């Protein structure tokens, strides 16, 4: 995996044929051209036996997207033991199973549509908890790191460079990019990174894939 993505632990895979398709169009001068566009598909996320949400996604890293979404919605806790993750590509469903029994029927009734180009959804009282989040005052962020990161990230082969119309988020350590995720919604890309980070702690079994 490290070799495939160069300096990244995980990164974009623009040559994956399932993520883009070729279309015929016209450029700004009216000339007929063939170009690539990103494919968008639904993914339904279950937590144990309960259907939580269907999100629109580019389709890579569905297991990390599901785990990260549930974590960022406060449906998964940091100390939860994830027993298994099952992904069925035929029906575009991910099932995350935990040792703890869960029931979010009441929380799912309270839905907030967030603003932005890709209107997202948050459940329950999540918006009220944002005020409690703070960054440690000892955190250091250097502008030289940002310039270096910008150069590295912008030159990385990606779906954005191949097809455009997609968002990207990158997990970094100082001036080194580690995990680069892309998706049709920036919140999806962030959820994938969160899912990756949680998987380092709590997921011992690999995702079971069908289809």
Segment roles from a protein language model:
Residues 2-174, 179-180:
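Intrinsically disordered, low-complexity regions enriched in acidic/Ser/Thr/Pro/Gln residues
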Residues 62, 186-187, 210:
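Alpha-helix N-cap/helix-start and coil->helix boundary motif
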Residues 159, 198-199:
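Short, flexible, glycine/charge-rich loop motifs used to bind or transfer phosphoryl groups or to couple energy/partner
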Residues 172, 199-200:
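A short alpha-helix capping/helix-coil boundary motif
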Residues 177, 182-189:
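Positively charged, proline/Ser/Thr-rich regional signature most characteristic
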Residues 187-198:
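A short, polar/charged loop-to-alpha-helix boundary motif
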Residues 201-211:
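Single conserved hydrophobic/aromatic residue that forms the stacking wall/gate
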């Amino acid at each position: 995996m490290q070799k495939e993505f160069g300096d990244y632990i995980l990164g974009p895979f623009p040559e994956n044929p399932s993520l883009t398709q070729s279309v015929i169009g016209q450029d700004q001068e009216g000339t007929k051209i063939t170009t690539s566009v990103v494919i968008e598909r639904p993914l339904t996320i279950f937590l144990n036996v309960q259907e939580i949400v269907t999100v629109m996604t580019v389709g890579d890293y569905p297991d990390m997207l599901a785990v990260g979404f549930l974590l960022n919605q406060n449906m998964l806790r940091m100390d939860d033991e994830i027993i298994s993750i099952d992904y069925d590509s035929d029906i575009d469903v991910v099932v995350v199973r935990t040792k703890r029994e869960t029931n979010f029927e009441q929380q799912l009734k309270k839905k907030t549509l967030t603003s932005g180009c890709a209107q997202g959804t948050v459940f329950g009282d999540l918006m009220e908890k944002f005020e409690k989040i703070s960054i440690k005052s000892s955190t250091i962020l250097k502008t030289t790191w940002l310039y270096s990161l910008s150069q590295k990230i912008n030159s990385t082969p990606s779906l954005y460079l191949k097809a455009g119309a997609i968002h990207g988020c990158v997990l970094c350590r100082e001036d080194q990019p580690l995990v680069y995720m892309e998706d049709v919604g920036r919140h999806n890309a962030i959820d994938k990174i969160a899912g990756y980070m949680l998987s380092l702690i709590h997921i011992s079994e690999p995702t079971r894939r069908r289809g």
